[in-house]
């Protein structure tokens, strides 16, 4: 059955007056190349934790954190998707091959994606570490259509949801039927001999909203017509189940952890514990956007915009994204970029594009000009030759990949706006359906099309 995905560029009405930016399409590609040159261990094809490292051995010796590796893995997929959107065959081939090498390197590093191995060096010992990979692997399947990516994505989701017989935990899902209150728990403790969860255990935004995102992606990609599994701990679920659980977890997390677009870090036994973090805002935006796309309920879109508005009105300084200095916190901007892309391009909210580009310009202006990498603090110049962690450095290339300098925001050339909105067109402007609807895309040959003034890749 044909599948199609929205790709990078919104072809909506022309933007209001544009600011002038000094970064170009080639500069953006180079920023990703520079990131990989400094941080990718090309022997193992996993990422190092900082620029002074020679090798990425393990958690204790040079390798970036397991969950951040998933964010860096997202970036190579984004590079490939952008190359597809731009019709750049050479880069498509390059990044498809690089993606495969990184996938195999990460799999080899992390116990062959055995999510029941909870060793604290190369294994899986926190629920959200696993769920970030669930998301990245689901996206890999959506991008490259290789069944193994979907298999590991589903296995990891179910391992988090139901727990592991080998590890002995009872799963992240805070089942209301068990009196646990709803949502998702962040961890199990002790790691090697877990106790059953209690209602007051920590339920964080960083597991709840990624769970929603993962469930939405799996709903979008698993086949229809599956039988309902009967095992106590299944390794896959039905298409309908994933959407049902996405909506359930979102409803709990939105009610419990969010106030007017501001996302709390989590909750123990009392009220929400508010501390602003950019990645929590990002995953709230992403979860809201995906549910809007799947259900058509505009309330989800409005919540996504509330989350974005809170960032730019309350968390930014002069419109520049906040930078946090805690271990691994530099990666937060890369996560935010991922889901702001969804809001801007896939949900048509181009009013945020200028703010994202402003941040890209500041990041670019404050890079180390010799190495091409940034310290992640867009308000502070990066000292030449200084030690930089890969988490913080990921912000610049992540933004550059997701918000192309050469975006076409003008209507399809030579076609009245009303007709362009209604029809399906090839990239060169040939009409293939004058009254196009998204469901018609499945009847077309594989390739790139414009439908509803958005680029769509049909597989």
What is each residue range found by the language model?
Residues 150-248:
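Aromatic- and glycine-enriched pocket-lining scaffold segments that form the walls
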Residues 1-4, 459:
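Positively charged n-region of N-terminal signal peptides that target proteins for export
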Residues 413-459:
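C-terminal outer-membrane/trafficking sorting elements
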Residues 8-18:
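Hydrophobic h-region of N-terminal signal peptides that target proteins for export
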Residues 209-210, 214-275, 282, 287, ...:
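Noncatalytic carbohydrate-binding groove/subsite architecture in carbohydrate-active enzymes
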């Amino acid at each position: 059955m044909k599948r199609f995905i929205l790709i990078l560029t919104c072809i909506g009405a022309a933007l209001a007056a544009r600011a002038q930016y000094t970064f170009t399409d080639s500069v953006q590609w180079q920023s990703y190349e520079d990131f990989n040159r400094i941080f990718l261990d090309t022997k193992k094809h996993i990422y190092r934790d900082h620029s002074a490292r020679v090798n990425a051995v393990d958690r204790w010796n040079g390798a970036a954190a397991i969950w951040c590796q998933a964010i860096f893995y997202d970036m190579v997929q984004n590079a490939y998707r952008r190359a597809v959107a731009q019709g750049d065959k050479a880069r498509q081939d390059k990044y498809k091959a690089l993606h495969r090498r990184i996938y195999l390197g990460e799999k080899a590093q992390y116990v062959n994606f055995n999510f029941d191995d909870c060793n604290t060096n190369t294994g899986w010992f926190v629920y959200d570490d696993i769920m970030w990979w669930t998301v990245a692997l689901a996206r890999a399947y959506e991008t490259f259509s290789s069944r193994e990516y979907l298999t590991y994505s589903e296995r990891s989701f179910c391992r988090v949801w139901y727990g592991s017989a080998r590890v002995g935990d009872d799963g992240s899902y805070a089942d209301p039927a068990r009196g646990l209150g709803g949502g998702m728990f962040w961890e199990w403790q002790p790691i090697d001999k877990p106790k059953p969860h209690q209602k007051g255990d920590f339920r964080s935004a960083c597991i709840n909203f990624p769970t929603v995102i993962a469930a939405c992606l799996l709903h979008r990609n698993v086949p229809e017509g599956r039988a309902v599994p009967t095992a106590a701990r299944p390794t896959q679920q039905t298409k309908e189940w994933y959407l049902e659980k996405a909506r359930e977890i979102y409803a709990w997390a939105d009610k419990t952890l969010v106030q007017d677009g501001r996302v709390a870090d989590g909750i123990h036994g009392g009220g929400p514990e508010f501390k602003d973090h950019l990645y929590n805002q990002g995953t709230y935006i992403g979860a809201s956007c995906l549910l809007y796309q799947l259900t058509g309920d505009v309330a989800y879109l409005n919540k996504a915009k509330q989350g974005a508005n809170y960032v730019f009105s309350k968390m930014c300084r002069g419109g520049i994204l906040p930078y946090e200095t805690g271990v691994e916190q530099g990666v937060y901007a890369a996560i935010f970029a991922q889901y702001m892309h969804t809001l801007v391009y896939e949900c048509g909210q181009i009013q945020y594009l200028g703010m994202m580009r402003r941040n890209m310009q500041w990041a670019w202006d404050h890079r180390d000009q010799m190495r091409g990498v940034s310290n992640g603090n867009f308000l502070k110049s990066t000292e030449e030759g200084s030690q930089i962690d890969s988490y913080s450095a990921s912000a610049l290339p992540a933004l550059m990949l997701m918000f192309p300098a050469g975006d076409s925001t003008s209507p399809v050339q030579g076609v009245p706006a009303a007709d362009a909105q209604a029809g399906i067109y090839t990239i060169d402007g040939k009409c293939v359906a004058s009254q196009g609807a998204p469901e018609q895309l499945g009847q077309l040959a594989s390739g790139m099309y414009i439908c509803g003034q958005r680029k769509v890749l049909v597989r």
